[in-house]
Amino acid sequence: MTEAAKKSTKKPVDDGNFDKEIISRWPDLELSQTRFMLNHPEVDSSVKEAKLEKLQETIKEFDMAPFYELVCADFKIVVDATQLAAMKAANQKKIDEITAEVEDAEKNLGESEVRQGLLRKFEYYCQIGDKDNALKAYTATYEKTVGMGYRIDVVFAMIRVGLFFLDHHLINKFITKAKELMEQGGDWERKNRLRSYEALYRMSVRDFAGAADLFLEAVPTFGSYELMTYENLILYTVITTTFALDRPDLRTKVIRCNEVQEQLTGGGLNGTLIPVREYLESYYDCHYDRFFIQLAALESERFKFDRYLSPHFNYYSRGMRHRAYEQFLTPYKTVRIDMMAKDFGVSRAFIDRELHRLIATGQLQCRIDAVNGVIEVNHRDSKNHLYKAVIKDGDILLNRIQKLARVINA
């Protein structure tokens, strides 16, 4: 059983106090990470065998019949018909028991007991990895739930179902729902949790700037251990902020952040945050040869094997190389290509290729004098750039005002 699952055994409590947690931490997101690793072509076969064995033990322990069928389909494993039938029978028995409790509560007890039963059914579908039935049970549970805090917890559980299957439509739908409920009276603790949920979602859809702001807000008051460990929160915070923030903000919000530095200095469990610390320091301190080494190491050892970051690791790596080149070139009017290549610890041909690509797409404001082997940097006129930005933003604002006026006058 994973750590998240061990924490999820407590039953819902309903005494009219809506501050108590009523939804367990199912579905267990560690299981979906294991499923991702088993699908990854670069994971060693012996590692896959060990992970698959552990996953099957968890599936059997919790009678996860729907998830078992998904896993078998993923890895082309022959379905054990006897085991599947036994798990389905156990699932049906449990659902029948809960349904009977709900029916009895409707006849003989009150709304509180009915709500308890519906919550248990919803939680059970989450536990066994049955997305479709969890969504149906959510509707019934939500309609019977009257406390604002309780309703938000049910919505959080549906966001986790979306994260479990990386169903972005489902995640976005219920994050929007959670925000609407927060505006109606969500408490401080749940607002903090929502930041972590939304940050993880934004990172998974490549919105690193949006994720960075939310992760930074979540760091001092983090409590969403059903989503990730605190160590992973620090990893994601460093990864997104180095990509999204400029140097002054990176220094203020990350380099000087006590909570972040405490974790980075400690190195994390088994030293897993040491490369993250070296990555951040080498980038900020302009040790570009070390930065390239650390970026490549994180890419090959962490990003590729993280189900949220894996689809974006090439995009992230290109973006960070661009930021490093821009940071390097900023103080210069001209600089030799071979000097830049030496500072980055790569060949001149590599730097030449990279710069040509970025110049051609307008991402770097410079030109290459191939005859003399020199890069000529064209620094933007900040006033002219600001003037153009004001004109552009003013046009957008004017268009919106005109649209609003048409709506009001209609």
Swiss-Prot record:
PROSITE patterns: PCI (PS50250). Keywords: Proteasome. InterPro entries: PCI_dom, Rpn7/CSN1, Rpn7_N, RPN7_PSMD6_C, WH_DNA-bd_sf. One of its GO terms (cellular component) is proteasome regulatory particle. Gene3D superfamilies: 1.25.40.570. Pfam families: PCI, RPN7, RPN7_PSMD6_C. One of its GO terms (biological process) is proteasome-mediated ubiquitin-dependent protein catabolic process. Expressed in multiple tissues including the intestine, pharynx and hypodermis. Residues 207-382 form the PCI domain. Belongs to the proteasome subunit S10 family. Acts as a regulatory subunit of the 26S proteasome which is involved in the ATP-dependent degradation of ubiquitinated proteins. This is 26S proteasome non-ATPase regulatory subunit 6. It comes from Caenorhabditis elegans.
